Every structure is written in C-alpha cells, then in structure tokens.
Amino acid sequence: MAKKIIGFIKLQIPAGKANPSPPVGPALGQRGLNIMEFCKAFNAQTQALEPGLPIPVVITAFADKSFTFVLKTPPATVLIKKAAKIDKGSSKPHTDKVGKITRAQAEEIAKTKMPDLTAADLDAAVRTIAGSARSMGITVEGV
C-alpha cells in the first residue's frame, strides 16, 4: 500500500543554498520532517545549477515523517531579468520600458521552462514567455 500523504509544501529556495533557517526550517519542522536531510539532498541536486538561482520545489510529506521532493524550473521572470540584464521589472510596464530581449533569448527561456509550461509547442511557449516579459516592461523583438 502507498504511504499516506499528509501534505505538500511549495518553496522557492536559492540553488545550493538550502539551510535550516526560514523559510525552510519552519515549513518542514511543522510537518515533523528531517530538515537537515532535506537541505543536504536539495543542495546535492542543485549543485550543478547556477548558485543563488531561485528554484521552486514541491515537497511531498508522508505520515511516517519521510518525504520526496520535485524540483521545478526557475521562474520565468528570473530568467527574463537575467537575459535582459536588469535587476527588476518596470513599475509601469506598459508605459516605461526597462529593457529588451530578442526572440532567440525568448526561445532559450521557453526551452528551459518547457517542462513546467502548458504550451503545446515551442512557438506557444515563446509567446507565453513574451507575454511575461511584456508585463514586466521588457520589449521582445521579433515576436
């Protein structure tokens, strides 16, 4: 018989930098999970990624205090800001443009995000990424 699931925990943790301090410690502690075991496993799986890149993770907590976790792709906004070489999006996205990305950059981001997007093909994924970029005040050339 399958283990009884007691809950899901969704967090965004910088790659390779999981530690017992908030938000990780309290979120896992209230479910009675081993915090250090998670931190070591997460850091081991994310060591190949760019350090500090926020990685969404979904932790499944079981009744016997064990857990599994699934890593997602970095948020599209983080990848877009990195491609446009800016720190934050525009406070008035449709009025003030703060940067621009090319279609090739949007395609690269779409390929990275493809496992987590609901888009049927790459072109639809590129349009999704372009829409996210426009809502941040970033111009997308060629889309």
From Swiss-Prot:
GO biological process assignments: translation
PTM annotation: One or more lysine residues are methylated.
Keyword entries, A-Z: Methylation, Ribonucleoprotein, Ribosomal protein, RNA-binding, rRNA-binding
GO CC annotations, alphabetized: cytosolic large ribosomal subunit
CDD domains listed in its UniProt record: Ribosomal_L11
Keyword match rRNA-binding: yes
GO molecular function, one term: structural constituent of ribosome
Pfam families in the cross-refs: Ribosomal_L11 (PF00298), Ribosomal_L11_N (PF03946)
The keyword Transferase is annotated on this UniProt entry: no
Membrane-spanning intervals of the chain: none
InterPro entries tied to this protein: Ribosomal_uL11, Ribosomal_uL11_bac-typ, Ribosomal_uL11_C, Ribosomal_uL11_C_sf, Ribosomal_uL11_CS, Ribosomal_uL11_N, Ribosomal_uL11_N_sf
Subunit structure: Part of the ribosomal stalk of the 50S ribosomal subunit. Interacts with L10 and the large rRNA to form the base of the stalk. L10 forms an elongated spine to which L12 dimers bind in a sequential fashion forming a multimeric L10(L12)X complex.
UniProt xrefs under NCBIfam families: L11_bact
Family: Belongs to the universal ribosomal protein uL11 family.
Function field: Forms part of the ribosomal stalk which helps the ribosome interact with GTP-bound translation factors.
Matches recorded under HAMAP family: Ribosomal_uL11
Protein name: Large ribosomal subunit protein uL11
